[in-house]
């Protein structure tokens, strides 16, 4: 759509001007003195006028001053004109050139006649016809031949054409200038009459010919010798106006301008090669809405033919709006199968045009871009009015063409010394569009300084190159992708780039208007002049062009400037071979730039419009070859065609740069490695040739290949001897045409590549990192005496890959190219950075919808390929995406920032069709890709494949075409957030390391949320203050074996203890460290009150002293701990091991008195320990159960050594038994070889050390040898069932194995039996337990030391927790705050243990005593310290309002009253607040803290273990401040401000699976339930089998508490005592339906009627049979209650609390 619109717009604009005016625009001499870029406004005006002018008006322009046109006549052609219609064909069909003509860049002496003939041709044909007249290479070749033959006949300059037609066949990019109007014989005639009108800016065969005409080269239009050609008066606007008014070409007076003296510009030959017209607005060629409407209103005889020509290529984008509207709306056209999308795009263009109002934007932008220079010559006018005829090859035309091509082409030439066009720029670009594309859309404005310099020199190249580099990467990408006709749009887009100056467009338009013959003549002249200039320029590869500029300072400089600018674009544009074509284009661009400088804005617009028409015609002819690319590449490609006849003309824009790149890279896959060398050598050769052609060598060759080839082809005209020299000679011509240099600038990209070795991924990546970096690299390359790498346009690369031959790569002098290229890079960097804009989707939504613009690095839709390969330093022939028609932008290392090609028509289709193309989301992020690239720089492409194998392979097609396979691979680097260390999911876990990741809260409180500690440092103060308790005392209390222990719950798992002990803040165990080694240091200095408080022994409150009374024995509640076991019973999971230190006898009974009870209890304890051993052998359960106790606690904890297990439960921390219980178990256990549950013997004993239980060990068998005889108080049950252990005196401990399995049985109904194979494990677990206890005493440091101990089975809580402290704050009392009632204070209480903190709700502090009643559950590690902080908020007292009355005496207002001395009294009443002193102002911390209490569990542990006691805790105010006089506020000493009345209960944990109570209330409720159980009583007759009865025997049984006493049936003597607390299950028939009568009973066991079984923890069974069902139900109910409680009563803490109750009761008695 853009193309069609642009062509139609150009045509419409061309129609606005009369032929004379357009001729004036074309014939205007480009004043050397004027700087084309000083006034971009005028150039824009010229462009607008040109766009508004009719083609007929532009055509006659060629008639004027043929001499001037001849050098510039080639630039007058659409190819040469800086402004080309967007529809201008990228690929110019190969123009048929007269074999005698040296090249398209040279114009014969008859260029004037050719210009006239071309005028005639244009008169006969519209611009659209010219654009689309020649759709195939044959037509183009014919037109080219006509154009070339005519100028050759007229000029009669010997030119060697090596198979012109063949060279310009569509196999090569159509960069040769074409007289598209010559399609008809009338066209040929016109071309004869107007040779200069249409010169194929793309390098003709003559240009590409290695042999140049032997005749001396004509003068270069832009050489300094022809200053009159480029007259740029200071008042450029006025002169432009005058030039616009002039119908005949008039030479404006020469005015000193930057073009006049190329030396004053530090441009390398590339810069000189790219004539730099002021950067046109991005959419200069795009018609405005008004133009589109006018165009629709205009009646054109051409549209149909032009439409047909365009449709021949099925390129609807080339159609104008009218054509498309007619095509879609007309009945005939409606029948045609056309893409509605084209119409939509056309409508979209209309809409965009209406919105954007391109004309106004162009004018405004042009004025904004306008340099201080007043007048800007229309380069078209300068061309038409050029007094100096271009020499044989018409290099100036080629330069104009190159300029035009550069305008069209994305500035791909890295070496072109273009300056940044600081126009409109999107810093971030437009999403979905490459920066280059956006630049093309946005008019870019060179800084006026840069405009003046870069307009002439850098703007064409720099704009073109940057445009080409940045844009041609996109355009060239698109063009490379489209590579031929389909990429016309991208080529047009390339013209739309902001980087292309309007003057570039104008120059390209003027060049395109110049006939091919004129171009050839001019190229020949330029070749000659360049050869002359090249001789001095040979010194430096690009300095050749510079020298050429210097020699023809006026023209050459101008030409060089233009050449430099356009060569950038042209070089970047040309896909086949940028070097030559770009150089030719550069020459043409210079000519064009010279003209644009001369052209007034109007004439420039006319010339541009005419040029656009010619461009449209050229595009028509060159559609297949890349219309727009061909235009700029037409000159470049003509050069390249001279160089490589075999090359297919491809997008001249892309080819200009990319051809150079492609030629350099694709012709040589090794060029990537050799790019720097090749480009440098090429630049050198080119510089040499340009030095030979010094006169015309304005633009140093930019593309190493193209420039080399071009230089060689030009050297052939100058010197037929060496093809390289021939190429260089035309290349020097192309130096005049900066496009060649721009292509040379493109070689600097290749230089970048050469700099980066193919395998040197890192350096290559650095080169390719950013386009700016690329520019900087280009700048570095562009330094004058540095070799310039071959410019690599992705399009040119792609074209080279597909169409160019590697052997065609020619080395070009790189020094000058580098110098110009460096400037270009500098300018380009600034420009590229500014130019990085993206075309909005509205502009080319359809075409780019599929294009993957992942980043600026994305050169082609196969982004991953580029990214993965990271712009392979080596360009392979197939590195370009052939199937996708993508230039291998990844190969363009110079362009780290890939840009999607502007024309993605083919790209989209190919992307859709190509499965290898990966969608943009698929490619990794560019950061990842870059990293992957960097990582994989030296790795093979197969490795790249993992990231994007499909795309890699399309890109690897380059490896297929390329003999070189990219050695870069992007590793499949994929961050998996679930597993990768880089994943942020666990990023913040370290924040919670202090209280353990995922650990349970160490503080719990109902209705309160547990948060991380906020006062950890304050909690440390307790530890510090405890040092006041003498170091030895503290160590003895807290450590075993003098080894540091964890000091608080704030400890991490023991596994990490060794790591954390030195770093743990709260629980720092390094007590003997230097800090803690001074016990008095902290207590005496820092917190003496705290030290004293911690040293003070706590005193439990008596009931009389309790202010907040609560019931000690709480009523039974459903939340009793007993309920929890009941719930757990159904779960069949052993939360707690049955083996526990427990009192088997009921707490109400005296265990010592009852031998049965003693025996049973002993057996129970034994079983419990066996269970512990079996179930927790690796866990040291006993050690866990029996936590290390301070030495002070040891006395209370253990009472007996023999039955340590029994005694352990009596310790404050673990349930212990009395000595009386432990004395008999040995006897009882030895009595029963079977170890029935009724017989209990303790198989282990507790090992004490330093007052703490260090572990347990099996009791010698002699002491615990079971007794086989019944002693009366024991029942020897020989009948063990369900896995019972056979009686064996020698395996007593082994007989306890069932208890090991009984842990689950305690909680489940499943029988818990232990096979005999477990017997061997018994002793070993005990040893492990022993070790583990000892290990725990050493803070588990020995855990690693003892491999046998495996703690993995023990929950971490077992390692960290040794009990629970229930801390209930009953209330605060004795609050020492004044005026509590008036302040209406509210306070909260925060408990902080250094790990977590919990804050209570607010309480009203309206009295000195406030009830709180909140209970906290704190996890106790080896030690526990915590603080309670009270924080208050209150209302500051408000002062009362006091009424104040004020009286004032005022003179009376009445005069009479005043006379009498009367006065008025005014009374004023005010309410003044009285200040109230806030008595709380200095008593609170900023956060409201006013009281703090420090608690150390060690102080209270002995007293509160197993029983709850109340205490008064002093709270201190540490925040009160006071001031003495004027001194600042100072914090006073802490003082007691309140007291907390608290109740504390410490419940030690004996087993990690032990279920502890949840509160003080639940603990006592559970104990009360057990106590009430002792009151249960039932009796009756039962038959017993099992235990001591081998057969069923009737007995009388009494159920008392948990004891079932068996009595003789008759005498009722006690025969046995069965400890029901050991029963784990009750088995009877039909438990579920016991209360139902109508049911059938099914059971797995044999049971008698009314029978039931009780199962013990060791698996032993005893059968009972009731006399009747009723009694059976009563027995079952009672037994079930007991069994239900058994799961709870086995808890060691229950036994402990029961024991404490007993002691308390006994003490009270």
UniProtKB/Swiss-Prot annotation:
Task of the protein: Required for establishment of the axial budding pattern in yeast cells. May be involved in the selection of future sites of septation in hyphal cells. Contributes to morphogenesis and is important for induction of hyphal growth. Also plays a role in epithelial adherence, and is involved in intestinal colonization and systemic infection. The role in adhesion is probably minor compared with its role in morphogenesis.
Region described as Disordered: spans on this chain: 1-27, 67-125, 192-281, 387-429, 448-472, 525-549, 595-746, 937-968, 1186-1349
InterPro entries, per database record: Bud4, PH-like_dom_sf, PH_domain
UniProt gene name: BUD4
Biased composition (Basic and acidic residues): 10-27, 111-122, 448-464, 595-623, 641-655, 662-671, 704-715
Domain PH: 1575-1684
Keyword annotations: Cell adhesion, Cell cycle, Cell division
Pfam families in UniProt: PH
Basic residues bias: start-end ranges: 1325-1342
Keyword field contains Cell cycle: yes
Main location: other
Subcellular location: Cell surface; Bud neck; Spore, Perispore
GO molecular function, one term: GTP binding
Record field: compositional bias (Low complexity): 67-77, 389-402, 953-962, 1222-1235
Keyword Cell cycle attached: yes
Family designation: Belongs to the BUD4 family.
Protein name from the UniProt record: Bud site selection protein BUD4
A Gene Ontology term for the protein's cellular component: cellular bud neck
GO biological process, one term: filamentous growth
Start-end of Polar residues biased regions: 78-108, 255-267, 687-697, 1186-1197, 1286-1315
Organism: Candida albicans (strain SC5314 / ATCC MYA-2876)
Highest taxon of the lineage: Eukaryota
